[in-house]
Amino acid sequence: MQENQQITKKEQYNLNKLQKRLRRNVGEAIADFNMIEEGDRIMVCLSGGKDSYTMLEILRNLQQSAPINFSLVAVNLDQKQPGFPEHVLPEYLEKLGVEYKIVEENTYGIVKEKIPEGKTTCSLCSRLRRGILYRTATELGATKIALGHHRDDILQTLFLNMFYGGKMKGMPPKLMSDDGKHIVIRPLAYCREKDIQRFADAKAFPIIPCNLCGSQTNLQRQVIADMLRDWDKRYPGRIETMFSAMQNVVPSHLCDTNLFDFKGITHGSEVVNGGDLAFDREEIPLQPAGWQPEEDENQLDELRLNVVEVK
């Protein structure tokens, strides 16, 4: 009995530590990009996947201790996909006491009518979904729309655009919507997918499968995701370094004439960012930039037992 109790406390300790890290990551992203302001009404887009559940949970947690006041309303779009469990999200949200709205729109039928069998439906489905969510945000008086994309999604998008689109373009943590009326935020921008997965598993969220529509996985994105996971295993810290690079862009050392006035460089111009300082002349840190090794998960149990609740 005592052993089982210790195991439970150890698991609780690890969950608390994980939740604190996610809280810190989300809090830093909110502060860095001014995502949430006093009086904001945040529409939290809830799909039923691990990412959106985690986003809602962390935002609810931060709401209790934040120095500003903001409200949350969870929104799910029921696209009438066959097998969609309509009862799951309402039951979960009512149990939490969270304000919510289920929007019912048969986008599944529209997509099936417009897209030939066997073709990827994601693009059209995404456009339809965006339009409905923007309309819903207006109806609810939401000042911000929160999406559950995380750090890995942002990096994958960067590499997708480099490999297949020929441009350096990621996924912004904060942006103006394409209809020009709504501010979209991604509070999980600094969060690692593996942390989110562990948190979702520990919290036992009622996950709804994401492939109910029967559409094929985006194979290009899957290739990139597999590549990044392989790099993360073989070269610890590389993912952190690449994400850090997205926050430390040096336009004068790229080739985009829209970002830097190369034509304006003449004799007598000042040196910009080290001039022609080649990479092999710079001091390279022994540890990858932005990387912090995780704490040893096998610490002595007695160091863990007194911590049972996140404050």
Swiss-Prot record:
Entry keywords, A to Z? 4Fe-4S, ATP-binding, Cytoplasm, Iron, Iron-sulfur, Magnesium, Metal-binding, Nucleotide-binding, RNA-binding, Transferase, tRNA processing, tRNA-binding
The Gene Ontology biological process terms listed for this entry are: tRNA thio-modification
**Enzyme kind, highest EC tier:** transferase
Record: residues binding [4Fe-4S] cluster? C122, C125, C213
**What does the cofactor section's free text say about binding?**
Binds 1 [4Fe-4S] cluster per subunit. The cluster is chelated by three Cys residues, the fourth Fe has a free coordination site that may bind a sulfur atom transferred from the persulfide of IscS.
- Quote the cellular component terms of the Gene Ontology held in the record: cytoplasm
Identify the Gene3D superfamilies for this entry: HUPs
| Subcellular location(s) of the protein | Cytoplasm
What pathway annotation does it carry?
Answer: tRNA modification
Keyword field contains Magnesium: yes
Q: Which residues cross the membrane?
A: none
Cross-referenced SUPFAM superfamilies, in alphabetical order? Adenine nucleotide alpha hydrolases-like
Broad class of where this protein is predominantly found: cytoplasm
InterPro entries per UniProt = Rossmann-like_a/b/a_fold, TilS/TtcA_N, tRNA_Cyd_32_2_STrfase, tRNA_thiolation_TtcA_Ctu1
Q: PP-loop motif: where is this motif?
A: 47-52
Q: Which reaction does it catalyse?
A: cytidine(32) in tRNA + S-sulfanyl-L-cysteinyl-[cysteine desulfurase] + AH2 + ATP = 2-thiocytidine(32) in tRNA + L-cysteinyl-[cysteine desulfurase] + A + AMP + diphosphate + H(+)
Q: Which domain of life is it from?
A: Bacteria
Give the matching HAMAP family.
TtcA
Additional facts recorded: The thiolation reaction likely consists of two steps: a first activation step by ATP to form an adenylated intermediate of the target base of tRNA, and a second nucleophilic substitution step of the sulfur (S) atom supplied by the hydrosulfide attached to the Fe-S cluster.
Physiological role: Catalyzes the ATP-dependent 2-thiolation of cytidine in position 32 of tRNA, to form 2-thiocytidine (s(2)C32). The sulfur atoms are provided by the cysteine/cysteine desulfurase (IscS) system.
Protein name according to UniProt: tRNA-cytidine(32) 2-sulfurtransferase
UniProt organism field: Escherichia coli O127:H6 (strain E2348/69 / EPEC)
